[in-house]
UniProtKB/Swiss-Prot annotation:
The protein's role, per its UniProt record: Involved in the biosynthesis of isopentenyl diphosphate (IPP) and dimethylallyl diphosphate (DMAPP), two major building blocks of isoprenoid compounds. Catalyzes the conversion of 4-diphosphocytidyl-2-C-methyl-D-erythritol 2-phosphate (CDP-ME2P) to 2-C-methyl-D-erythritol 2,4-cyclodiphosphate (ME-CPP) with a corresponding release of cytidine 5-monophosphate (CMP).
Quaternary structure, from the entry: Homotrimer.
EC numbers for this chain: 4.6.1.12
Protein name: 2-C-methyl-D-erythritol 2,4-cyclodiphosphate synthase
Catalytic activity annotation: 4-CDP-2-C-methyl-D-erythritol 2-phosphate = 2-C-methyl-D-erythritol 2,4-cyclic diphosphate + CMP
Site, Transition state stabilizer: residue positions: H39, T135
InterPro entries recorded: MECDP_synthase, MECDP_synthase_CS, MECDP_synthase_sf
Positions of 4-CDP-2-C-methyl-D-erythritol 2-phosphate binding: D12, V13, H14, H39, S40, D61, L62, G63, T134, T135, T136, D137, R144
GO terms (BP aspect): isopentenyl diphosphate biosynthetic process, methylerythritol 4-phosphate pathway; terpenoid biosynthetic process
Stored Pfam families: YgbB
UniProt cofactor note: Binds 1 divalent metal cation per subunit.
Sites where the protein binds a divalent metal cation: D12, H14, H47
Family: Belongs to the IspF family.
């Protein structure tokens, strides 16, 4: 394995379900009418970060590590999954440089709690995580409010 940095991309999408708690970017968004459906808490930002880390390290994907066949992760927080993903990446011989995640959806508006979200995900990851948000201008499942998505990029460096 060369000592060159490696980059991975992760994507996660969840349906929004009325009455479900809205966990996004390691935070509970009180007052949201719907939250992401999922085996765990459905935190698309944390899940995309996990997938980006796994991809960068060549360790598979979120489903391989935390999928529905693993009952111990049912209802798990995205922060818990991200902390475990970071541990596995380090155990495989990598240091985490940083992770960047973009949340795609109409709600919640991540910009108003960006610093808090970055702190929560960075704490879980043990490395800097930047958080941004965007919409699809009313197009597609996120634009219609049917779902929420996230896209992440991670940089890891072999030790």
């Amino acid at each position: 394995m060369s000592g060159l940095p490696r980059v991975g991309t992760g994507v996660d999408v969840h349906q929004l379900v009325a009455g479900r708690p809205c966990w996004v970017a390691g935070l509970l968004w009180e007052g949201e009418a719907a939250g992401p459906e999922g085996h765990s808490d459905g935190d698309v930002a944390a899940h995309a970060c996990c997938d980006a880390l796994f991809a960068a390290a060549g360790l598979g994907d979120l489903g391989a590590h935390f999928g529905t066949a693993r009952p111990e992760f049912a209802g798990a927080s995205g922060a818990r999954l991200l902390a475990e993903a970071a541990r596995l990446v380090r155990e495989a011989g990598f240091e985490i440089g940083n992770v960047s995640v973009q949340v795609v959806g109409n709600r919640p508006k991540v910009g108003r709690r960006r610093a808090e979200a970055q702190a929560a995900l960075s704490r879980a990851c043990g490395a800097p995580v930047s958080v941004a948000g965007t919409t699809t201008d009313a197009l597609g499942l996120t634009g219609r409010g049917e779902g929420i998505a996230a896209i992440a990029t991670a940089l890891v460096v072999p030790r």
